[in-house]
Amino acid sequence: MPKKTILFITLILLALTVLSCKKEVLPKPSSHLRLDYPEANYVQFESQCPFTFEMNADAIIKGEKECGFTISYPKMKATIYLTYKPVNGDINKLLRDAQKLTYEHVIKADDILEQPFLNPQQKVFGMFYQVDGNAATNSQFYATDSTKHFVTGSVYFYAKPNFDSIMPAASYIKNDMQRLLETLKWK
């Protein structure tokens, strides 16, 4: 074998040896976004409207006309919209409209879980909806005494609906909405 060939093979082997001495490349482990929210502290909300409820002290509430409210969660980019309507013999229409609003999300929803709500002592009856999937809203409810008062609530996020991404915030706010419904009282 000529000297040039031996030298060439030796240089290639030496180069391969030097290049192969790098640290072993390991795949990057998958990571998960960790979102920690403070433990909810609830305060009583009072207004001139014919109902009261408890809400998260970290949320910001703004009054709208006709006893409608927005409860904002700026850190989560979410808002609960509360709407009040007096019942004027049109309870069936109000119920139909509230249910229709929820089921408009069937196209994007993976599942809609209905949870009836009954509080006979306070005369508050309603339904809580948990909407799973990439729907515009993840939680909604309606509550009524069936003779005078009707309240609806729904949460919306200011982000493209991607349930996996907003699930921690959606779960946190869902708990706040359930607390609101459970503490709702008519005046």
Predicted regions and their residues:
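Bacterial N-terminal signal peptides that target proteins for export
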Residues: 1-9
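C-terminal motif of bacterial Sec signal peptides marking the signal peptidase cleavage site
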Residues: 17-20
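Bacterial lipoprotein signal-peptidase II cleavage site
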Residues: 22-28
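Post-signal peptide N-terminal segment of mature Sec-exported envelope proteins
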Residues: 29-49
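Secretory pathway targeting signatures of secreted, lumenal, and periplasmic proteins
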Residues: 46-100
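Second-shell loop/turn segments in exported
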Residues: 80-89, 140-141, 163-171
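Signature of long, low-cysteine stretches enriched in small and polar/charged residues
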Residues: 99-154
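Surface-exposed amphipathic alpha-helical segments
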Residues: 154-187
